[in-house]
Amino acid sequence: MVTINQLVRKSRSNKIIKTNVPALSSCPQKRGVCIRVYTTTPKKPNSALRKVCRVRLTNGFEVTSYIGGEGHNLQEHSSVLIRGGRVKDLPGVRYHIVRGALDCAGVKNRKKARSKYGVKKIKNK
């Protein structure tokens, strides 16, 4: 137990909470421009060609973000919206691209979990 005198000499310090998404600077999403769109391979037990892109954000940060879903229309100089959320098997990828926002189109022929991939509801007649 700390005494009052000890508290007078040195007050209690608050715990520093480290953010997992520093480039967003306390915003839910940030806009950026694609610098490079490429594929990369995941860590050991998994095998695939994951679609990622290097994005320069409006606040000057440059981050690698993951392009979710099957197929995409992104290329260099595309304007994209990124959100937080890491990809467990890709080291250094801590952001996701929001599908269906700005220049990034939604996933074609998507019927389930549409909101995650920027797809509008189909009108049945």
From Swiss-Prot:
Superkingdom of the organism of origin: Bacteria
InterPro entries registered for this protein in UniProt: NA-bd_OB-fold, Ribosomal_uS12, Ribosomal_uS12_bac
Keyword RNA-binding: yes
GO cellular component terms given for this protein: small ribosomal subunit
Residues found modified as 3-methylthioaspartic acid: 89
GO BP term, example: translation
Record text on subunit structure and interactions: Part of the 30S ribosomal subunit. Contacts proteins S8 and S17. May interact with IF1 in the 30S initiation complex.
Name of the protein in question: Small ribosomal subunit protein uS12
Protein species of origin: Wigglesworthia glossinidia brevipalpis
Lineage start: Bacteria, Pseudomonadati, Pseudomonadota, Gammaproteobacteria, Enterobacterales
